[in-house]
Amino acid sequence: MSDILDTLRQEGVDPALLTAVQEYRAAHPLSEALRPRIPAPAFTYYGKEVWEQALAAILCGENLLLAGGKATGRNVLAENLAAAFGRPAWDISFHVNMDAASLIGMDTFAGGQVVFRPGPVYRCAQCGGFGVLDEINMAKNEALAVLHAV
């Protein structure tokens, strides 16, 4: 993970932003059980201005909407951001049948009892992770309403 920050230093990304990312990671340690969910990006996203805008937005507590054509690096950037912050990531692919229960979770029967089975958005929020919402343009209003509440 520090290699991503080293790469960003070499790319000339604002050192104050990189220091803030390191401080964030130190202030928000991750349990060992979640470490395998931290992405190990196969590719590095390059683009100093995009990195600086994305880092600043996340450090300010904002969400990002990465828009663009096919093969423009949106998922690569999202994976790199999660790795840079040292946070687990959940890839959530939307489709026309996606509903609120698929995202947040639902009750299910297990071991003779009704138990709550958390969905990916619930787990992501609970663990302070990055939710990579793919094909969000396919989402129904019901699913989008859940995201507005998160």
Model-inferred region functions:
Residues 1-150:
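AAA+ P-loop NTPase catalytic core and its hallmark functional loops
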